Every structure is written in structure tokens, then in C-alpha cells.
């Protein structure tokens, strides 16, 4: 089990990223727009830099929904390889069966 503080930190980052997603997209559109003046684009870049660092979605970490482990997480299931195997063997993952050939 991961430390609760780390799990909560990631949850907080996800909420912050959702909160600022529209504003970030708007500013990035201005920055990428070649028809805008250099001054407007520069001001948009400064405003983007003023946003909280944790509002950037790349600072989030995929974590297992059961254990909070940050590595070996399958995106499709939201589980680490350990928990995925354990739950699949118990039949708790719909549609997943043990391979045999």
C-alpha cells in the first residue's frame, strides 16, 4: 500500500488539472496562433507560467485504484500487475480468462 499522503497528492493534482484545463487550453491556443502579435503571445505565455505547477496534467501519476502503487499499472483496468493477476485468478475481472494453448 502506498503512503496515503502520496495518493492524496495525486488526487489533489487531478482536481487542480481539471479546474485549470480550460484556461490552459485557451492560453496554449493563443500561444500557438501565428496570427496573434508577438506581444499577445508573450503575455499568454506569462499567464500560463503563473498558473499552479500542479495544474499541468503531466504531473499526475497513474496509480493502482486498489493499492495506490505507482508502477506497473495497466491503464485499461487501473490496476497494477500484481492486483490484476490476483483478481483475474479469482474471476473478479469481467471477460478475463487465463490463457491456454
UniProtKB/Swiss-Prot annotation:
Name one cellular component (GO) term: small ribosomal subunit
GO BP terms, alphabetized: translation
- Give the GO molecular function terms: rRNA binding; structural constituent of ribosome
Keyword annotations from UniProtKB, A to Z: Ribonucleoprotein, Ribosomal protein, RNA-binding, rRNA-binding
| Listed PANTHER family | 30S RIBOSOMAL PROTEIN S14, SMALL RIBOSOMAL SUBUNIT PROTEIN US14M
What is the similarity comment for this entry?
Belongs to the universal ribosomal protein uS14 family.
Subunit field text: Part of the 30S ribosomal subunit. Contacts proteins S3 and S10.
Question: So what does this one do?
Answer: Binds 16S rRNA, required for the assembly of 30S particles and may also be responsible for determining the conformation of the 16S rRNA at the A site.
Q: What is this protein called?
A: Small ribosomal subunit protein uS14
Q: Which organism is it from?
A: Bordetella pertussis (strain Tohama I / ATCC BAA-589 / NCTC 13251)
The root-end lineage is:
Bacteria, Pseudomonadati, Pseudomonadota, Betaproteobacteria, Burkholderiales
Amino acid at each position: 500500500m502506498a503512503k496515503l499522503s502520496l495518493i492524496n497528492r495525486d488526487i489533489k493534482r487531478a482536481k487542480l488539472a481539471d479546474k485549470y484545463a480550460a484556461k490552459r487550453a485557451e492560453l496554449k491556443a493563443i500561444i500557438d496562433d501565428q496570427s496573434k502579435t508577438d506581444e499577445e503571445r508573450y503575455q499568454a505565455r506569462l499567464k500560463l507560467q503563473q498558473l499552479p505547477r500542479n495544474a499541468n496534467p503531466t504531473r499526475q501519476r497513474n496509480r493502482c485504484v486498489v493499492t495506490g502503487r505507482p508502477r506497473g499499472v495497466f491503464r485499461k483496468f487501473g490496476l497494477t500487475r500484481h492486483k490484476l493477476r490476483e483478481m483475474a485468478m479469482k474471476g473478479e475481472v469481467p471477460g478475463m480468462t487465463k490463457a491456454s494453448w
